[in-house]
């Protein structure tokens, strides 16, 4: 009995202790949450006062507990996103001979974000990472002064600099469109190799971070030998070209010293408009494509194509596209035909036009009818065709109305530039009235090119009639926008027909084991597949709000499509019908 009482008492005590421990945990959690709320209150107050003190980042207040004034500098808490990593700065503070191979490789990996650094060969990248030092300068600081001897060359890791012709760089802050160099660019390489005088002034437009290579380290670590290998490669490339067959080696080396190699990966943008570029590009390896962003809404062919296909919006069979009369319409038609000497079809159409006006015709267009204009009085045999209306927002173009959703653009390949070809000289010697001023995009397919400034190249070919005759033969006539639009529509029709045929002939796959509970509503434009579906233009769907939308300045001026699904006849009606094998109906 006593043993039973002891066991029972122990169980009660255990339960009470468990409840006590549970209550203790709750109290601790409440206290911790209270401490978090008190701490976050200061952050909320800082968010309120931060914008007010942005112009005066240092402020102070009187602390009653310590009986003294506390000073707070908001600039110490600004996020340093995009700045050069502190770990790499510590490495660059060492002498080049003290840096280990792992540290050099670490710096080399960090610098891969710089396009100008990535264009060098791998051995030269490692040598540059070994001798670089880090510098940070503020706004209006002159980095290079015109007329001075070049002792360093620079890579821009963060910030922007301007190129000017004055000595103090003040004109960069007065010029509305100064020449700018931004992150990833480099300057001063040519002057450091040949110990020449600076031909321009470089000034910081904002706080800028540089990676600097000094002349002493450049030659002490034999970087000049690696640079000479690249120069010899460029010389051999130019010497093999028929364009420079008549040039002497001395003159060709002048071209080599002013040129620079750049490498681009597959799909990388080389130039948004190479016609307006200040460089001439020689394709030394690989190939690239010339693209044109077409505004399809500005093409008369696209305008006709859209409205021809929208006539099939009701999805009727091939020979019964005109919709059948309803009983009420047949009765009204009978009333009109009951008067042998008069035709009231014009009054009927006028009444319909007034009704459409009340409903708002600015957001609709009639298609597939002969009632756009009032018919002439030709007797009682006139039969008014039924009118079908497209209810959607319209925009006015120079070719007429067009559905707002159908105003899209498409990228078209204009030309493929292969190895050994030249870009930037195809319109160099044409009159201004004959030049093609359309913006043309240059996209890499994995290539290497050699750049040289146009003004330098023009100085080298001055008074060289033989060279000018060769350059005149390089003129390329690109197709017009209308021709490219027609080609796009032809390719689009074939691609859609091919998909319809495959969908009809190939057996569908088995349904997935877990079908979606609620299917997604079909939208007119699908940004993932880049397809415009005009079949759904007359259907109302609730807008789906995306989680993230890019700012408008980062988006193209038009919605880009790769294909357009237009209303079309069913492919079963277009294929031949057979009673049996080999016997047509």
UniProtKB/Swiss-Prot annotation:
UniProt keyword terms in alphabetical order: cAMP, cAMP-binding, Cytoplasm, Nucleotide-binding
GO cellular component terms, semicolon-separated: cytosol
SUPFAM superfamilies, per database record: cAMP-binding domain-like (SSF51206)
Annotated a nucleoside 3',5'-cyclic phosphate binding sites: 116-239
Compartmental location: Cytoplasm, Cytosol
UniProt cross-references to InterPro entries, sorted A to Z: cNMP-bd_CS, cNMP-bd_dom, cNMP-bd_dom_sf, RmlC-like_jellyroll
CDD domains from the UniProt entry: CAP_ED (cd00038)
Pfam family, one: cNMP_binding
GO molecular function, one term: cAMP binding
GO biological process: spermatogenesis
Coiled-coil annotated spans: none
Role description: Essential for male fertility. Plays an important role in spermatogenesis and regulates sperm motility by controlling the development of the flagellar bending of sperm.
Name of this chain's protein: Cyclic nucleotide-binding domain-containing protein 2
Gene designation per UniProt: CNBD2
